[in-house]
Protein backbone atom coordinates (compact mmCIF):
# COMPACT_ATOMS: atom_id res chain seq x y z
CA UNK A 1 0.00 0.00 0.00
CA UNK A 2 1.34 3.44 -0.91
CA UNK A 3 2.02 5.89 1.92
CA UNK A 4 -0.78 8.41 2.41
CA UNK A 5 0.62 11.59 0.81
CA UNK A 6 -1.25 13.86 3.26
CA UNK A 7 0.53 12.51 6.32
CA UNK A 8 4.08 13.15 5.24
CA UNK A 9 5.26 9.59 5.66
CA UNK A 10 7.67 8.27 8.25
CA UNK A 11 7.41 9.66 11.74
CA UNK A 12 4.36 11.78 11.00
CA UNK A 13 2.51 8.88 9.47
CA UNK A 14 3.14 6.65 12.44
CA UNK A 15 2.12 9.47 14.78
CA UNK A 16 -1.25 9.78 13.06
CA UNK A 17 -1.72 6.03 12.74
CA UNK A 18 -1.23 5.49 16.48
CA UNK A 19 -3.22 8.54 17.63
CA UNK A 20 -6.70 7.95 19.07
CA UNK A 21 -9.10 9.06 16.31
CA UNK A 22 -10.70 12.49 16.63
CA UNK A 23 -14.21 12.43 18.01
CA UNK A 24 -16.71 14.21 15.74
CA UNK A 25 -14.34 13.83 12.82
CA UNK A 26 -17.17 13.69 10.28
CA UNK A 27 -19.01 16.68 11.69
CA UNK A 28 -15.80 18.72 11.79
CA UNK A 29 -14.97 17.72 8.20
CA UNK A 30 -18.45 18.78 7.08
CA UNK A 31 -18.33 22.13 8.89
CA UNK A 32 -14.88 22.78 7.47
CA UNK A 33 -15.84 21.95 3.89
CA UNK A 34 -18.90 24.26 4.15
CA UNK A 35 -16.89 27.08 5.66
CA UNK A 36 -14.11 26.93 3.08
CA UNK A 37 -16.55 26.58 0.16
CA UNK A 38 -18.53 29.60 1.38
CA UNK A 39 -15.42 31.74 1.51
CA UNK A 40 -13.40 30.48 -1.44
CA UNK A 41 -13.17 32.66 -4.52
CA UNK A 42 -14.32 35.72 -2.60
CA UNK A 43 -10.81 36.94 -1.86
CA UNK A 44 -8.58 39.17 -3.99
CA UNK A 45 -10.82 41.83 -5.45
CA UNK A 46 -13.82 40.45 -3.50
CA UNK A 47 -15.27 41.47 -0.19
CA UNK A 48 -13.20 39.02 1.85
CA UNK A 49 -9.52 39.70 2.54
CA UNK A 50 -8.77 36.01 2.94
CA UNK A 51 -9.26 32.99 5.16
CA UNK A 52 -6.95 32.52 8.13
CA UNK A 53 -6.51 29.52 10.39
CA UNK A 54 -5.57 30.79 13.87
CA UNK A 55 -4.33 28.21 16.37
CA UNK A 56 -4.41 29.16 20.03
CA UNK A 57 -3.66 27.81 23.51
CA UNK A 58 -1.46 24.92 24.59
CA UNK A 59 -1.67 21.25 23.66
CA UNK A 60 -1.55 18.55 26.31
CA UNK A 61 0.38 15.30 26.30
CA UNK A 62 -1.51 12.57 28.20
CA UNK A 63 0.67 10.37 30.39
CA UNK A 64 -2.02 7.73 30.84
CA UNK A 65 -4.62 6.41 28.38
CA UNK A 66 -7.43 6.98 30.88
CA UNK A 67 -5.93 10.31 31.49
CA UNK A 68 -5.50 11.66 34.98
CA UNK A 69 -2.08 13.25 34.46
CA UNK A 70 -0.77 15.10 31.45
CA UNK A 71 1.99 17.47 30.44
CA UNK A 72 0.71 20.87 29.46
CA UNK A 73 2.17 23.89 27.70
CA UNK A 74 1.79 27.33 29.20
CA UNK A 75 -0.53 29.43 27.06
CA UNK A 76 -3.59 31.40 28.07
CA UNK A 77 -4.73 31.73 24.46
CA UNK A 78 -4.59 35.51 24.81
CA UNK A 79 -2.52 35.92 21.63
CA UNK A 80 -4.78 33.80 19.45
CA UNK A 81 -8.01 35.27 20.80
CA UNK A 82 -6.85 38.87 20.34
CA UNK A 83 -5.46 38.13 16.88
CA UNK A 84 -8.75 36.55 15.81
CA UNK A 85 -10.56 39.78 16.68
CA UNK A 86 -8.15 41.83 14.56
CA UNK A 87 -8.31 39.40 11.63
CA UNK A 88 -12.11 39.60 11.67
CA UNK A 89 -11.87 43.38 11.81
CA UNK A 90 -9.53 43.30 8.79
CA UNK A 91 -12.15 41.38 6.80
CA UNK A 92 -10.90 37.81 7.16
CA UNK A 93 -12.90 34.68 7.76
CA UNK A 94 -11.28 32.85 10.69
CA UNK A 95 -10.97 29.17 11.54
CA UNK A 96 -10.10 29.31 15.24
CA UNK A 97 -8.46 26.08 16.47
CA UNK A 98 -8.34 26.57 20.22
CA UNK A 99 -7.60 24.76 23.44
CA UNK A 100 -10.77 24.02 25.40
CA UNK A 101 -11.07 26.54 28.23
CA UNK A 102 -8.54 29.00 26.75
CA UNK A 103 -9.28 32.68 26.07
CA UNK A 104 -11.93 33.36 23.46
CA UNK A 105 -12.30 36.24 21.01
CA UNK A 106 -14.23 39.16 22.52
CA UNK A 107 -14.10 37.58 25.98
CA UNK A 108 -10.56 38.58 26.87
CA UNK A 109 -11.62 41.40 29.16
CA UNK A 110 -13.56 39.08 31.45
CA UNK A 111 -12.50 38.52 35.05
CA UNK A 112 -10.77 35.16 34.88
CA UNK A 113 -12.53 33.22 37.56
CA UNK A 114 -15.79 34.90 38.19
CA UNK A 115 -17.85 36.13 35.36
CA UNK A 116 -20.62 36.64 37.92
CA UNK A 117 -18.69 39.61 39.30
CA UNK A 118 -19.69 41.41 36.09
CA UNK A 119 -23.40 41.27 36.81
CA UNK A 120 -25.92 42.32 39.39
CA UNK A 121 -29.67 42.08 39.71
CA UNK A 122 -31.79 45.21 39.42
CA UNK A 123 -34.81 45.94 41.59
CA UNK A 124 -37.08 43.99 39.30
CA UNK A 125 -34.68 41.05 39.10
CA UNK A 126 -33.44 42.22 35.73
CA UNK A 127 -29.82 41.46 34.90
CA UNK A 128 -27.64 44.56 35.00
CA UNK A 129 -24.03 45.27 34.18
CA UNK A 130 -22.44 47.97 36.33
CA UNK A 131 -21.91 51.21 34.36
CA UNK A 132 -18.13 50.74 34.54
CA UNK A 133 -18.30 47.55 32.46
CA UNK A 134 -21.41 48.11 30.35
CA UNK A 135 -19.75 49.58 27.25
CA UNK A 136 -17.11 46.89 26.95
CA UNK A 137 -19.59 44.05 27.53
CA UNK A 138 -22.00 45.45 24.94
CA UNK A 139 -19.30 45.88 22.32
CA UNK A 140 -18.15 42.32 22.97
CA UNK A 141 -21.64 40.88 22.57
CA UNK A 142 -22.22 42.93 19.39
CA UNK A 143 -18.94 41.97 17.68
CA UNK A 144 -19.20 38.33 18.64
CA UNK A 145 -22.80 38.06 17.40
CA UNK A 146 -21.81 39.74 14.12
CA UNK A 147 -18.95 37.29 13.46
CA UNK A 148 -21.14 34.29 14.24
CA UNK A 149 -24.23 35.53 12.39
CA UNK A 150 -22.23 36.40 9.26
CA UNK A 151 -20.57 32.99 9.29
CA UNK A 152 -17.08 34.45 9.54
CA UNK A 153 -15.89 32.46 12.55
CA UNK A 154 -15.55 28.68 12.80
CA UNK A 155 -14.40 27.43 16.20
CA UNK A 156 -12.74 24.02 16.55
CA UNK A 157 -11.63 22.93 20.04
CA UNK A 158 -8.79 20.59 21.04
CA UNK A 159 -7.16 19.40 24.23
CA UNK A 160 -4.41 16.89 23.39
CA UNK A 161 -1.53 17.05 20.92
CA UNK A 162 -3.29 14.19 19.09
CA UNK A 163 -6.45 16.23 18.57
CA UNK A 164 -4.54 19.38 17.66
CA UNK A 165 -2.43 17.81 14.92
CA UNK A 166 -5.37 15.94 13.44
CA UNK A 167 -7.35 19.19 13.29
CA UNK A 168 -4.41 21.04 11.75
CA UNK A 169 -4.10 18.36 9.10
CA UNK A 170 -7.82 18.54 8.31
CA UNK A 171 -7.85 22.33 8.12
CA UNK A 172 -4.58 22.39 6.17
CA UNK A 173 -5.80 20.05 3.47
CA UNK A 174 -9.27 21.68 3.39
CA UNK A 175 -7.72 25.14 2.90
CA UNK A 176 -5.39 23.99 0.14
CA UNK A 177 -8.02 24.90 -2.48
CA UNK A 178 -7.78 28.53 -1.34
CA UNK A 179 -4.20 28.68 -2.60
CA UNK A 180 -2.55 31.97 -1.71
CA UNK A 181 -5.75 33.37 -0.17
CA UNK A 182 -5.18 31.07 2.78
CA UNK A 183 -3.15 32.02 5.82
CA UNK A 184 -1.95 30.00 8.79
CA UNK A 185 -1.25 31.88 12.00
CA UNK A 186 0.09 29.24 14.35
CA UNK A 187 0.05 30.77 17.81
CA UNK A 188 -0.74 27.56 19.72
CA UNK A 189 1.90 26.30 22.14
CA UNK A 190 2.49 22.85 20.72
CA UNK A 191 4.14 20.06 22.71
CA UNK A 192 7.61 19.06 21.55
CA UNK A 193 7.53 15.74 23.39
CA UNK A 194 4.86 13.10 23.75
CA UNK A 195 4.22 9.58 24.95
CA UNK A 196 3.13 7.39 22.02
CA UNK A 197 -0.40 6.15 22.65
CA UNK A 198 0.49 2.47 22.45
CA UNK A 199 3.31 2.75 24.99
CA UNK A 200 1.20 4.76 27.43
CA UNK A 201 0.15 3.43 30.84
CA UNK A 202 -3.46 2.27 30.65
CA UNK A 203 -4.38 3.29 34.19
CA UNK A 204 -3.35 6.03 36.58
CA UNK A 205 0.34 5.65 37.38
CA UNK A 206 0.85 4.29 40.91
CA UNK A 207 2.50 6.70 43.30
CA UNK A 208 3.50 4.28 46.02
CA UNK A 209 6.64 2.90 44.46
CA UNK A 210 9.20 5.70 44.64
CA UNK A 211 10.28 8.23 42.02
CA UNK A 212 8.76 8.26 38.55
CA UNK A 213 10.90 7.88 35.46
CA UNK A 214 9.51 8.91 32.11
CA UNK A 215 10.84 8.90 28.59
CA UNK A 216 9.12 11.10 26.04
CA UNK A 217 9.53 11.03 22.26
CA UNK A 218 9.81 14.04 20.00
CA UNK A 219 6.64 15.13 18.24
CA UNK A 220 7.16 15.05 14.45
CA UNK A 221 7.67 18.55 13.04
CA UNK A 222 4.35 19.10 11.30
CA UNK A 223 5.11 22.66 10.17
CA UNK A 224 7.27 21.15 7.49
CA UNK A 225 4.45 18.91 6.27
CA UNK A 226 1.89 21.72 6.40
CA UNK A 227 4.17 23.80 4.19
CA UNK A 228 5.21 21.04 1.79
CA UNK A 229 2.07 18.97 1.47
CA UNK A 230 -1.10 20.15 3.12
CA UNK A 231 -1.27 23.75 1.91
CA UNK A 232 1.89 24.67 -0.01
CA UNK A 233 0.63 28.00 -1.40
CA UNK A 234 -0.69 29.43 1.84
CA UNK A 235 0.92 32.29 3.73
CA UNK A 236 2.43 30.72 6.85
CA UNK A 237 3.15 32.49 10.12
CA UNK A 238 4.52 30.52 13.05
CA UNK A 239 5.59 31.56 16.54
CA UNK A 240 8.73 30.92 18.52
CA UNK A 241 8.55 31.35 22.27
CA UNK A 242 11.64 31.16 24.43
CA UNK A 243 12.49 32.17 27.96
CA UNK A 244 16.14 32.83 27.13
CA UNK A 245 16.45 35.99 24.97
CA UNK A 246 19.97 35.04 23.91
CA UNK A 247 18.81 32.17 21.74
CA UNK A 248 15.39 33.46 20.66
CA UNK A 249 16.11 35.23 17.35
CA UNK A 250 18.60 32.64 16.30
CA UNK A 251 16.00 29.91 16.82
CA UNK A 252 13.34 31.95 15.02
CA UNK A 253 15.61 32.31 11.99
CA UNK A 254 16.39 28.61 12.02
CA UNK A 255 12.64 27.85 12.04
CA UNK A 256 12.06 30.27 9.15
CA UNK A 257 14.57 28.41 6.99
CA UNK A 258 13.87 24.89 8.18
CA UNK A 259 10.09 24.97 7.75
CA UNK A 260 9.86 27.50 4.91
CA UNK A 261 7.64 29.88 6.89
CA UNK A 262 6.82 33.32 5.47
CA UNK A 263 7.11 34.88 8.92
CA UNK A 264 8.27 33.62 12.29
CA UNK A 265 7.08 35.78 15.17
CA UNK A 266 9.63 35.65 17.99
CA UNK A 267 8.49 36.35 21.52
CA UNK A 268 9.79 36.01 25.05
CA UNK A 269 7.75 34.63 27.91
CA UNK A 270 8.64 37.63 30.09
CA UNK A 271 7.15 40.30 27.79
CA UNK A 272 5.13 38.57 25.08
CA UNK A 273 2.25 40.99 25.52
CA UNK A 274 4.49 44.02 25.01
CA UNK A 275 6.79 43.23 22.12
CA UNK A 276 7.31 40.70 19.32
CA UNK A 277 9.86 40.51 16.52
CA UNK A 278 8.68 39.51 13.04
CA UNK A 279 11.44 37.53 11.36
CA UNK A 280 11.25 37.15 7.56
CA UNK A 281 13.73 36.42 4.80
CA UNK A 282 14.00 40.21 4.36
CA UNK A 283 15.02 40.86 7.95
CA UNK A 284 13.50 41.67 11.30
CA UNK A 285 10.71 44.03 12.32
CA UNK A 286 10.09 44.82 15.97
CA UNK A 287 6.47 45.47 16.94
CA UNK A 288 5.76 47.13 20.29
CA UNK A 289 2.41 48.05 21.76
CA UNK A 290 2.13 51.80 22.24
CA UNK A 291 0.73 51.45 25.79
CA UNK A 292 -0.57 48.91 28.28
CA UNK A 293 -4.09 49.71 27.07
CA UNK A 294 -3.27 48.57 23.54
CA UNK A 295 -2.81 45.11 22.06
CA UNK A 296 0.49 44.34 20.35
CA UNK A 297 -1.62 42.13 18.06
CA UNK A 298 -3.30 45.16 16.47
CA UNK A 299 -0.17 46.34 14.68
CA UNK A 300 1.12 42.81 14.16
CA UNK A 301 -2.04 41.77 12.30
CA UNK A 302 -1.97 45.03 10.27
CA UNK A 303 1.53 44.19 9.05
CA UNK A 304 0.72 40.55 8.36
CA UNK A 305 -2.43 41.44 6.41
CA UNK A 306 -0.32 43.75 4.25
CA UNK A 307 2.27 41.04 3.65
CA UNK A 308 -0.43 38.50 2.91
CA UNK A 309 -2.03 40.75 0.31
CA UNK A 310 1.38 41.15 -1.34
CA UNK A 311 1.69 37.36 -1.29
CA UNK A 312 -1.69 37.13 -3.08
CA UNK A 313 -0.79 39.91 -5.57
CA UNK A 314 2.41 38.12 -6.44
CA UNK A 315 0.37 35.25 -7.82
CA UNK A 316 -1.87 37.63 -9.74
CA UNK A 317 1.22 39.25 -11.28
CA UNK A 318 2.65 35.84 -12.15
CA UNK A 319 -0.63 34.87 -13.79
CA UNK A 320 -0.70 38.22 -15.63
CA UNK A 321 2.78 37.67 -17.01
CA UNK A 322 1.71 34.31 -18.38
CA UNK A 323 -1.33 35.67 -20.26
CA UNK B 1 17.60 25.69 65.22
CA UNK B 2 14.60 23.54 66.12
CA UNK B 3 12.49 22.15 63.27
CA UNK B 4 9.40 24.22 62.57
CA UNK B 5 6.58 22.16 64.12
CA UNK B 6 4.04 23.31 61.52
CA UNK B 7 5.92 21.79 58.61
CA UNK B 8 6.09 18.22 59.86
CA UNK B 9 9.85 17.91 59.58
CA UNK B 10 11.79 15.77 57.16
CA UNK B 11 10.54 15.57 53.61
CA UNK B 12 7.73 18.06 54.13
CA UNK B 13 10.04 20.60 55.67
CA UNK B 14 12.49 20.40 52.82
CA UNK B 15 9.61 20.63 50.32
CA UNK B 16 8.44 23.90 51.88
CA UNK B 17 11.95 25.25 52.31
CA UNK B 18 12.76 24.77 48.63
CA UNK B 19 9.38 25.93 47.27
CA UNK B 20 9.20 29.40 45.69
CA UNK B 21 7.43 31.57 48.30
CA UNK B 22 3.73 32.28 47.78
CA UNK B 23 3.04 35.66 46.24
CA UNK B 24 0.62 37.75 48.32
CA UNK B 25 1.40 35.65 51.36
CA UNK B 26 0.76 38.52 53.77
CA UNK B 27 -2.52 39.54 52.18
CA UNK B 28 -3.74 35.92 52.15
CA UNK B 29 -2.74 35.48 55.81
CA UNK B 30 -4.64 38.66 56.71
CA UNK B 31 -7.79 37.68 54.80
CA UNK B 32 -7.67 34.23 56.35
CA UNK B 33 -7.26 35.49 59.90
CA UNK B 34 -10.20 37.89 59.43
CA UNK B 35 -12.39 35.22 57.90
CA UNK B 36 -11.71 32.65 60.62
CA UNK B 37 -12.08 35.22 63.43
CA UNK B 38 -15.42 36.37 62.00
CA UNK B 39 -16.76 32.83 61.94
CA UNK B 40 -15.19 31.29 65.03
CA UNK B 41 -17.39 30.68 68.04
CA UNK B 42 -20.54 31.00 65.96
CA UNK B 43 -20.85 27.26 65.34
CA UNK B 44 -22.56 24.66 67.49
CA UNK B 45 -25.75 26.26 68.76
CA UNK B 46 -25.04 29.41 66.71
CA UNK B 47 -26.24 30.45 63.30
CA UNK B 48 -23.28 28.93 61.45
CA UNK B 49 -23.04 25.18 60.92
CA UNK B 50 -19.25 25.32 60.68
CA UNK B 51 -16.34 26.42 58.54
CA UNK B 52 -15.20 24.19 55.71
CA UNK B 53 -12.09 24.39 53.58
CA UNK B 54 -12.94 23.04 50.11
CA UNK B 55 -10.03 22.37 47.76
CA UNK B 56 -10.81 22.09 44.08
CA UNK B 57 -9.16 21.57 40.69
CA UNK B 58 -5.78 20.08 39.82
CA UNK B 59 -2.31 21.18 40.87
CA UNK B 60 0.46 21.62 38.32
CA UNK B 61 4.08 20.53 38.53
CA UNK B 62 6.35 22.95 36.66
CA UNK B 63 9.09 21.28 34.64
CA UNK B 64 11.03 24.51 34.17
CA UNK B 65 11.60 27.42 36.56
CA UNK B 66 10.49 29.93 33.94
CA UNK B 67 7.63 27.66 33.26
CA UNK B 68 6.57 26.80 29.74
CA UNK B 69 5.82 23.13 30.36
CA UNK B 70 4.21 21.51 33.35
CA UNK B 71 2.52 18.31 34.40
CA UNK B 72 -1.13 18.78 35.20
CA UNK B 73 -3.79 16.69 36.92
CA UNK B 74 -7.14 16.19 35.28
CA UNK B 75 -9.83 18.01 37.23
CA UNK B 76 -12.43 20.46 36.01
CA UNK B 77 -13.17 21.63 39.54
CA UNK B 78 -16.79 20.57 39.08
CA UNK B 79 -16.85 18.58 42.33
CA UNK B 80 -15.41 21.37 44.47
CA UNK B 81 -17.56 24.10 42.91
CA UNK B 82 -20.79 22.12 43.30
CA UNK B 83 -19.90 21.08 46.84
CA UNK B 84 -19.20 24.69 47.81
CA UNK B 85 -22.72 25.65 46.75
CA UNK B 86 -24.23 22.89 48.90
CA UNK B 87 -22.05 23.73 51.91
CA UNK B 88 -23.15 27.37 51.68
CA UNK B 89 -26.75 26.23 51.42
CA UNK B 90 -26.24 24.10 54.54
CA UNK B 91 -25.10 27.17 56.47
CA UNK B 92 -21.33 26.79 56.30
CA UNK B 93 -18.72 29.47 55.72
CA UNK B 94 -16.44 28.21 52.94
CA UNK B 95 -12.75 28.75 52.25
CA UNK B 96 -12.51 27.75 48.59
CA UNK B 97 -8.93 26.88 47.56
CA UNK B 98 -9.22 26.51 43.79
CA UNK B 99 -7.13 26.11 40.68
CA UNK B 100 -7.08 29.29 38.60
CA UNK B 101 -9.46 28.88 35.68
CA UNK B 102 -11.32 25.90 37.17
CA UNK B 103 -15.09 25.75 37.68
CA UNK B 104 -16.50 28.26 40.14
CA UNK B 105 -19.49 28.02 42.48
CA UNK B 106 -22.72 29.15 40.77
CA UNK B 107 -21.00 29.28 37.37
CA UNK B 108 -21.09 25.57 36.61
CA UNK B 109 -23.98 25.86 34.16
CA UNK B 110 -22.08 28.22 31.88
CA UNK B 111 -21.14 27.20 28.35
CA UNK B 112 -17.47 26.35 28.74
CA UNK B 113 -15.89 28.41 26.04
CA UNK B 114 -18.28 31.13 25.18
CA UNK B 115 -20.09 32.95 27.86
CA UNK B 116 -21.12 35.43 25.17
CA UNK B 117 -23.47 32.80 23.77
CA UNK B 118 -25.62 33.46 26.85
CA UNK B 119 -26.30 37.06 25.97
CA UNK B 120 -27.82 39.18 23.24
CA UNK B 121 -28.44 42.87 22.76
CA UNK B 122 -31.99 44.20 22.84
CA UNK B 123 -33.31 46.87 20.51
CA UNK B 124 -32.05 49.61 22.76
CA UNK B 125 -28.64 48.00 23.18
CA UNK B 126 -29.63 46.63 26.55
CA UNK B 127 -28.09 43.32 27.59
CA UNK B 128 -30.58 40.47 27.47
CA UNK B 129 -30.45 36.83 28.43
CA UNK B 130 -32.61 34.57 26.27
CA UNK B 131 -35.71 33.37 28.14
CA UNK B 132 -34.37 29.80 28.15
CA UNK B 133 -31.40 30.78 30.33
CA UNK B 134 -32.76 33.74 32.28
CA UNK B 135 -33.93 31.88 35.39
CA UNK B 136 -30.70 29.97 35.91
CA UNK B 137 -28.50 33.03 35.32
CA UNK B 138 -30.55 35.13 37.75
CA UNK B 139 -30.45 32.49 40.46
CA UNK B 140 -26.70 32.20 40.00
CA UNK B 141 -26.14 35.94 40.30
CA UNK B 142 -28.41 36.12 43.37
CA UNK B 143 -26.78 33.22 45.25
CA UNK B 144 -23.26 34.31 44.41
CA UNK B 145 -23.90 37.91 45.51
CA UNK B 146 -25.45 36.68 48.76
CA UNK B 147 -22.44 34.50 49.64
CA UNK B 148 -20.00 37.31 48.87
CA UNK B 149 -22.02 40.09 50.54
CA UNK B 150 -22.54 38.06 53.72
CA UNK B 151 -18.84 37.26 53.89
CA UNK B 152 -19.42 33.51 53.76
CA UNK B 153 -17.06 32.72 50.88
CA UNK B 154 -13.30 33.28 50.79
CA UNK B 155 -11.66 32.34 47.49
CA UNK B 156 -7.94 31.52 47.34
CA UNK B 157 -6.46 30.57 43.95
CA UNK B 158 -3.47 28.34 43.18
CA UNK B 159 -1.79 26.93 40.11
CA UNK B 160 1.26 24.88 41.17
CA UNK B 161 1.68 22.15 43.76
CA UNK B 162 3.95 24.60 45.61
CA UNK B 163 1.19 27.21 45.90
CA UNK B 164 -1.44 24.63 46.79
CA UNK B 165 0.45 23.05 49.67
CA UNK B 166 1.50 26.41 51.09
CA UNK B 167 -2.13 27.56 51.02
CA UNK B 168 -3.30 24.32 52.64
CA UNK B 169 -0.75 24.76 55.39
CA UNK B 170 -1.84 28.36 56.00
CA UNK B 171 -5.53 27.48 56.04
CA UNK B 172 -4.90 24.37 58.14
CA UNK B 173 -3.05 26.22 60.87
CA UNK B 174 -5.47 29.20 60.72
CA UNK B 175 -8.47 26.88 61.15
CA UNK B 176 -6.93 24.99 64.06
CA UNK B 177 -8.55 27.43 66.52
CA UNK B 178 -11.97 26.29 65.26
CA UNK B 179 -11.32 22.83 66.69
CA UNK B 180 -14.07 20.41 65.75
CA UNK B 181 -16.13 23.11 64.02
CA UNK B 182 -13.63 23.02 61.18
CA UNK B 183 -13.93 20.70 58.22
CA UNK B 184 -11.56 19.90 55.38
CA UNK B 185 -13.06 18.66 52.13
CA UNK B 186 -10.07 17.91 49.95
CA UNK B 187 -11.41 17.45 46.44
CA UNK B 188 -8.39 18.92 44.61
CA UNK B 189 -6.43 16.57 42.36
CA UNK B 190 -3.00 16.87 43.94
CA UNK B 191 0.17 15.87 42.12
CA UNK B 192 1.91 12.78 43.48
CA UNK B 193 5.20 13.59 41.75
CA UNK B 194 7.16 16.80 41.37
CA UNK B 195 10.46 18.21 40.26
CA UNK B 196 12.20 19.89 43.22
CA UNK B 197 12.60 23.59 42.47
CA UNK B 198 16.37 23.61 42.84
CA UNK B 199 16.88 20.72 40.42
CA UNK B 200 14.55 22.20 37.81
CA UNK B 201 15.73 23.43 34.41
CA UNK B 202 15.99 27.22 34.49
CA UNK B 203 14.92 27.75 30.87
CA UNK B 204 12.62 26.01 28.44
CA UNK B 205 13.90 22.49 27.82
CA UNK B 206 15.50 22.20 24.36
CA UNK B 207 13.65 19.95 21.97
CA UNK B 208 16.36 19.45 19.38
CA UNK B 209 18.36 16.80 21.15
CA UNK B 210 16.27 13.64 20.97
CA UNK B 211 13.94 12.08 23.53
CA UNK B 212 13.39 13.66 26.93
CA UNK B 213 14.13 11.78 30.12
CA UNK B 214 12.66 12.99 33.37
CA UNK B 215 12.84 11.83 36.94
CA UNK B 216 10.19 13.05 39.35
CA UNK B 217 10.19 12.80 43.14
CA UNK B 218 7.24 11.89 45.30
CA UNK B 219 5.35 14.77 46.88
CA UNK B 220 5.39 14.41 50.69
CA UNK B 221 2.04 13.14 51.99
CA UNK B 222 0.65 16.30 53.56
CA UNK B 223 -2.69 14.75 54.60
CA UNK B 224 -0.83 13.12 57.43
CA UNK B 225 0.62 16.43 58.60
CA UNK B 226 -2.71 18.23 58.24
CA UNK B 227 -4.29 15.61 60.49
CA UNK B 228 -1.48 15.35 63.03
CA UNK B 229 -0.23 18.91 63.29
CA UNK B 230 -2.04 21.65 61.42
CA UNK B 231 -5.64 21.00 62.49
CA UNK B 232 -5.86 17.78 64.53
CA UNK B 233 -9.46 18.26 65.75
CA UNK B 234 -11.02 19.08 62.40
CA UNK B 235 -13.32 16.76 60.49
CA UNK B 236 -11.30 15.56 57.50
CA UNK B 237 -12.69 14.31 54.20
CA UNK B 238 -10.32 13.35 51.42
CA UNK B 239 -10.91 11.94 47.94
CA UNK B 240 -9.45 8.97 46.15
CA UNK B 241 -9.74 8.91 42.37
CA UNK B 242 -8.73 5.87 40.37
CA UNK B 243 -9.36 4.67 36.84
CA UNK B 244 -9.16 1.01 37.82
CA UNK B 245 -12.25 0.04 39.88
CA UNK B 246 -10.54 -3.11 41.12
CA UNK B 247 -8.13 -1.22 43.36
CA UNK B 248 -10.25 1.82 44.23
CA UNK B 249 -11.94 0.81 47.50
CA UNK B 250 -8.89 -0.94 48.76
CA UNK B 251 -6.83 2.22 48.22
CA UNK B 252 -9.52 4.38 49.81
CA UNK B 253 -9.47 2.19 52.93
CA UNK B 254 -5.70 2.33 53.06
CA UNK B 255 -5.84 6.14 52.91
CA UNK B 256 -8.47 6.23 55.68
CA UNK B 257 -6.17 4.32 58.02
CA UNK B 258 -2.85 5.80 56.92
CA UNK B 259 -3.85 9.46 57.17
CA UNK B 260 -6.49 9.18 59.90
CA UNK B 261 -9.24 10.70 57.74
CA UNK B 262 -12.83 10.72 58.99
CA UNK B 263 -14.13 9.95 55.51
CA UNK B 264 -12.47 9.00 52.24
CA UNK B 265 -14.71 9.54 49.23
CA UNK B 266 -13.86 6.99 46.55
CA UNK B 267 -14.65 7.79 42.94
CA UNK B 268 -13.86 6.49 39.49
CA UNK B 269 -12.87 8.69 36.58
CA UNK B 270 -15.47 7.03 34.35
CA UNK B 271 -18.52 7.92 36.49
CA UNK B 272 -17.44 10.40 39.16
CA UNK B 273 -20.46 12.59 38.50
CA UNK B 274 -22.89 9.71 39.00
CA UNK B 275 -21.70 7.78 42.01
CA UNK B 276 -19.25 7.98 44.92
CA UNK B 277 -18.58 5.65 47.84
CA UNK B 278 -18.06 7.16 51.29
CA UNK B 279 -15.56 5.02 53.17
CA UNK B 280 -15.41 5.43 56.98
CA UNK B 281 -14.24 3.30 59.87
CA UNK B 282 -17.88 2.15 60.19
CA UNK B 283 -18.11 0.87 56.63
CA UNK B 284 -19.10 2.04 53.18
CA UNK B 285 -22.00 4.14 51.95
CA UNK B 286 -22.75 4.42 48.25
CA UNK B 287 -24.19 7.74 47.08
CA UNK B 288 -25.81 7.90 43.65
CA UNK B 289 -27.43 10.88 42.00
CA UNK B 290 -31.13 10.24 41.36
CA UNK B 291 -30.95 11.56 37.77
CA UNK B 292 -28.67 13.34 35.32
CA UNK B 293 -30.35 16.61 36.33
CA UNK B 294 -29.20 16.21 39.94
CA UNK B 295 -25.79 16.64 41.55
CA UNK B 296 -24.36 13.69 43.45
CA UNK B 297 -22.81 16.36 45.71
CA UNK B 298 -26.22 17.32 47.10
CA UNK B 299 -26.71 14.06 49.00
CA UNK B 300 -23.00 13.68 49.71
CA UNK B 301 -22.82 17.05 51.46
CA UNK B 302 -26.06 16.28 53.38
CA UNK B 303 -24.48 13.14 54.78
CA UNK B 304 -21.16 14.82 55.56
CA UNK B 305 -22.86 17.73 57.32
CA UNK B 306 -24.70 15.22 59.50
CA UNK B 307 -21.48 13.37 60.31
CA UNK B 308 -19.70 16.62 61.02
CA UNK B 309 -22.37 17.74 63.45
CA UNK B 310 -22.03 14.39 65.26
CA UNK B 311 -18.28 15.00 65.35
CA UNK B 312 -18.94 18.39 66.99
CA UNK B 313 -21.52 16.94 69.42
CA UNK B 314 -19.06 14.31 70.51
CA UNK B 315 -16.80 17.03 71.86
CA UNK B 316 -19.72 18.71 73.60
CA UNK B 317 -20.61 15.40 75.24
CA UNK B 318 -17.00 14.88 76.28
CA UNK B 319 -16.89 18.37 77.77
CA UNK B 320 -20.21 17.72 79.51
CA UNK B 321 -18.90 14.54 81.12
CA UNK B 322 -15.93 16.46 82.47
CA UNK B 323 -18.00 19.19 84.13
Curated annotation (Swiss-Prot), chains A, B:
Pathways per UniProt: Cofactor biosynthesis; coenzyme A biosynthesis; CoA from (R)-pantothenate: step 2/5
BP GO terms, sorted: coenzyme A biosynthetic process
EC number: 6.3.2.5
TM segment ranges: none
Classification via InterPro entries: CoaB-like_sf, DNA/pantothenate-metab_flavo_C
Record GO terms (molecular function): phosphopantothenate--cysteine ligase activity
Subunit structure: Homodimer.
Superkingdom of source: Eukaryota
Catalytic reaction annotation: (R)-4'-phosphopantothenate + L-cysteine + CTP = N-[(R)-4-phosphopantothenoyl]-L-cysteine + CMP + diphosphate + H(+)
Functional summary from the UniProt entry: Catalyzes the first step in the biosynthesis of coenzyme A from vitamin B5, where cysteine is conjugated to 4'-phosphopantothenate to form 4-phosphopantothenoylcysteine.
Organism, scientific name: Oryza sativa subsp. japonica (Rice)
Keywords (A to Z) from UniProt: Coenzyme A biosynthesis, Ligase
Sequence similarity: Belongs to the PPC synthetase family.
S-S bonds: none
Protein name, per record: Phosphopantothenate--cysteine ligase 2
Pfam families xref list: DFP
